[in-house]
Regions:
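Alpha-helix termini
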Residues: 110-113, 182-183
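A general structural signal for stabilizing positions within well-ordered secondary structure
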Residues: 71, 113-114
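Active-site acidic/histidine clusters and adjacent loop/turn architecture
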Residues: 74-111
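Basic/polar, cationic surfaces and motifs that engage anionic cell-wall
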Residues: 1-87, 125-237
Length: 237
C-alpha cells in the first residue's frame, strides 16, 4: 500500500510539472515576439508563418528627420506600388534596421538622390517586419507622376532571380490589408509593380511574377514603363 501511494504521488508531481513548465522568453530587446532568439532569421522562428504584422517606427530604426515638410497625401489613395531596394537583403531585425538607415542616407545625400527623406512609404524585411518610411500620410518620391495617389512598399533586397521570403511577402500583404482597414487605401485600390509605371527593373522579375497573382493586380502599363528583355509575355498597353 505504501509503495502504491508513493508511485501515485510521483506521477502527480511529474504531471503537474509538465503542465506548468514554460519555454523561456528570448529576445534581444528590440523584437516583441516571444521565443525568438536574438538575431535569428525568420526561417528559424518558433512562431507559425505568417506572424502578426509588426511595423518598426521611424524612432525605432533611428530615422533622420526630413529635410523639409513633406507633401501630404489625399486619403484614401488608389494605387499600391511594389518596389525593391536593389540592395542586399536582410533576415534579422538588426540587419534590416541597418539597411533601412543606409537607404535613407543614400536617398537624402546631396551628392546622390538629394530627396527630402527616404523615398518609400514603407519597407518590408526578410524577417517579416514592416518599416515605416514616409508612412501613410505623406507623398513618396519613388515613381514620377504617380506619387500623389499611391503608397509604395519596398521589399528590402534584390529580387531579379530570387524570390522574397514567405514572411516578407506576408508582411506586405498584411500592410496592404491594414491600409484598407484604416481607410488609407481605397477598397478598390490597384496593385502595380514599380516597373509598370517607371523605367526601372524594380521590383525584380521574380517578385513581379508573384505580384501578378495577388488581388487587385492592375494588368496595365504606363507610357514610361520598363521593358524586360527576358520577358516575352509582358503586357502591352
Amino acid at each position: 500500500m505504501v509503495i502504491i501511494t508513493t508511485i501515485v504521488i510521483v506521477i502527480m508531481v511529474a504531471t503537474s510539472a509538465g503542465k506548468t513548465r514554460l519555454k523561456p522568453h528570448y529576445g534581444d530587446g528590440d523584437d516583441d515576439r516571444a521565443y525568438v532568439p536574438p538575431d535569428t532569421g525568420i526561417d528559424n522562428d518558433f512562431l507559425p508563418d505568417p506572424k502578426p504584422l509588426r511595423i518598426v517606427t521611424r524612432n525605432e530604426w533611428l530615422a533622420s528627420p526630413p529635410k523639409e515638410e513633406l507633401t501630404p497625401l489625399t486619403l484614401p489613395v488608389n494605387k499600391v506600388i511594389i518596389a525593391h531596394t536593389a540592395t542586399e537583403g536582410c533576415t534579422t531585425q538588426s540587419m534590416c534596421v541597418f539597411l533601412t538607415g543606409h537607404i535613407q542616407q543614400f536617398h537624402m545625400a546631396s551628392d546622390s538622390k538629394n530627396f527630402s527623406d527616404i523615398a518609400y512609404n514603407f519597407l518590408v524585411g526578410g524577417e517579416g517586419n514592416a518599416y515605416e518610411g514616409r508612412g501613410w500620410e505623406s507623398q513618396g518620391a519613388h515613381t514620377k507622376g504617380f506619387n500623389r495617389d499611391s503608397i509604395c512598399i519596398a521589399f528590402i533586397g534584390t529580387f531579379s532571380s530570387v524570390e522574397p521570403s514567405k514572411a516578407q511577402l506576408s508582411a506586405a500583404q498584411q500592410l496592404i490589408a491594414l491600409g484598407v482597414e484604416e481607410n488609407k487605401l481605397a477598397k478598390n485600390y490597384r496593385l502595380y509593380g514599380h516597373r509598370q509605371l517607371a523605367p526601372f527593373e524594380s521590383p525584380g522579375r521574380a517578385l513581379y511574377k508573384i505580384l501578378q497573382k495577388w488581388p487587385h493586380w492592375a494588368n496595365e502599363l504606363s507610357n514610361n514603363h520598363w521593358s524586360d528583355p527576358e520577358d516575352q509575355n509582358s503586357t502591352r498597353q
